[in-house]
Amino acid sequence: MRRTSSGRFTVFLIDDDQGTLDTLNSLLRAVGYETKAYTAPQPFLDEHDPAVHGCTLLDLSMPGLNGLDVQQELVRRGIDRPIIFLTESDSVLARVEAFKAGAIDFLIKPAKEAELLSAIRAAVKRDSERLHSYAVAKRVDTLTPRERQVLALVVRGVSNKNIAVALGIREKSIEVNRSRAMKKLGAKNVSELVRMTKKLATESKLS
């Protein structure tokens, strides 16, 4: 079974053509991916779990909700799992809208096997980063208000002495709060902490 550091990778297949789903299922399972197939978008949306490591392989033209509608609904829910469009439509407007909303690829049926697998490998990498960000964001939620205050200044490069002055507490207290917060976040040093928070764009959450 294909795995990454974040665990098993599942490709969610959404297409109203059963033959297409069968072909994709066979191909992707043969190379080691898990798959879950849907002939309509709504059941996928109803049971969607953003904590699952995976990507969505999505048709554009379907009865009811189309692929762009599904993408917009996921965006509305704040779910940024990678999306790859696989469609017969080569609409420039649809392509632009899909990429503007965060799609990582827009493939035209019948896509070459190598092209499809390359897009999914890119999705594996992207979603590993997403889940890492998700995990660290959950750790941020465990910080105390004081730890958040201290870290918000640490990641901006403010010295312990100046943080102590700004917060009206002793420098020793700054060191203790910084050490506790770094342990909670899993950061080995300040440089790693800064990289982590910048990548996650969580400085505003720490403020």
Identify the role of each PLM range:
Residues 179-207:
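Basic, Lys/Arg-enriched C-terminal extension of HTH/homeodomain DNA-binding domains
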Residues 51-57:
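Active-site beta3 strand of CheY-like receiver
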Residues 59, 87:
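Active-site residues of response regulator receiver
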Residues 91-93, 111-120, 162, 166:
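C-terminal output helix
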Residues 39-40, 66-69:
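Acidic catalytic/metal-coordinating carboxylates
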Residues 68-79:
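Short amphipathic alpha-helix used as the core "switch/output" element in two-component signaling
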Residues 62:
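Receiver (REC) domain active-site loop signature in two-component systems and cognate sites
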